[in-house]
Amino acid sequence: MATDSWALAVDEQEAAAESLSNLHLKEEKIKPDTNGAVVKTNANAEKTDEEEKEDRAAQSLLNKLIRSNLVDNTNQVEVLQRDPNSPLYSVKSFEELRLKPQLLQGVYAMGFNRPSKIQENALPLMLAEPPQNLIAQSQSGTGKTAAFVLAMLSQVEPANKYPQCLCLSPTYELALQTGKVIEQMGKFYPELKLAYAVRGNKLERGQKISEQIVIGTPGTVLDWCSKLKFIDPKKIKVFVLDEADVMIATQGHQDQSIRIQRMLPRNCQMLLFSATFEDSVWKFAQKVVPDPNVIKLKREEETLDTIKQYYVLCSSRDEKFQALCNLYGAITIAQAMIFCHTRKTASWLAAELSKEGHQVALLSGEMMVEQRAAVIERFREGKEKVLVTTNVCARGIDVEQVSVVINFDLPVDKDGNPDNETYLHRIGRTGRFGKRGLAVNMVDSKHSMNILNRIQEHFNKKIERLDTDDLDEIEKIAN
């Protein structure tokens, strides 16, 4: 199947990363290799964070690749039922769902011992008789893909050789990730087949598809349902729209998804998932899913209470680097993440730190998603102690050993104003899991001092000045 070659490519990518050791290089101009070590390249790297604005689909794929297990989600789940008078069920075991034996076997073979928080509440609604529509908010790593795959597999009649379940994903790569979950969970259903409705998958005009489940991107699925008539939309029993927040950020996907939904029968079960519930996503969800049950996560606010924040006054890039060296010389740092505004600065800094003997990994937006995943995995395993990055990984990466976050450049938006949300996500990489963290901000101009002051005002938290030429002062902050 298509997944095999793609998964193999990822394995090869990570195997290549394993075999590369840290490189000691004299050149300033570098680019990231698969293991985040540094190698020569041309100087065409002058891109700001805003220009390489984090691509939502790539970030979502990255989160899937780097998560080997479910995240321990402490958020409260809020269930808003379509019929407030009907009883509200949640389950604590998969046996309570009365699944077909082959499905239960598949669930356990995947390593799921009990339902995750989102699964506890979503599965009884999705597997109810008659099936109910659902809009659910869930981040990567909460088990939502397994939940909707279970719903699809529960409805499929393997003896019927035509599409019965349709799942829309924003990109080919995300479709393949969902496909892998279907193949794993459905492996005790040998007669169950899966088709990918993605660009490049050429079929003869007029051909009918015999696979019971189709996963694809909106444009190709729309063509297959309408123009090419490969799929009879009136026979679809379950329609899943995954990553809705990513979907509406992509030109044309929103309209295509709505057009597909309008072709489906009235009794088709509609399921929509999104990591966020901003107004644009909510409006889209209501167009696509009639009479829904809604599951929301009451998000616990990220807090700065466990993080000590400092700033260092510098007059140049070299002074900022020297301040960084002084920090490393005075205190023990398990692992650190250092954020830069441009790829060029990140590349230069990674090279300089490497020359000083540090084990450095480098992340930037020009890397393929699989390369980024390999770099993050190595950092998580402690093979590199310093991760230098642009905004590309400010979110979603939990590395327990990160004790220090350094803003080599303060985060600003495209207009040069403080990007408070990014600041919060950046320094939130430390002080995780209830531990105390340390954040150090480099300030090298009146403008960056103004940015820092505005960040202080926004969070109502004082950021103390730190003199990195005073070793005693540095040692105090570590206690």
Curated annotation (Swiss-Prot):
PROSITE patterns: HELICASE_ATP_BIND_1, HELICASE_CTER, Q_MOTIF. The keyword Phosphoprotein does not apply. Residues 34-54 are annotated as: Disordered. Residues 2-300 are annotated as: N-terminal lobe. GO terms for biological process: mRNA export from nucleus; poly(A)+ mRNA export from nucleus. The modification N-acetylalanine is found at A2. Residues 55-68 are annotated as: N-terminal helix. Changing I258A: Impairs interaction with NUP214. GO terms for cellular component: cytoplasm; cytoplasmic stress granule; extracellular exosome; membrane; nuclear envelope; nuclear pore; nucleoplasm; nucleus. Residues 306-474 form the Helicase C-terminal domain. It is an enzyme of class 3 (hydrolase). CDD domains: SF2_C_DEAD (cd18787). InterPro entries: DEAD/DEAH_box_helicase_dom (IPR011545), Helicase_ATP-bd (IPR014001), Helicase_C-like (IPR001650), P-loop_NTPase (IPR027417), RNA_helicase_DEAD_Q_motif (IPR014014). Associates with the nuclear pore complex via interaction with NUP214. Interacts with NUP214 or RNA in a mutually exclusive manner. This is ATP-dependent RNA helicase DDX19B. It comes from Homo sapiens.
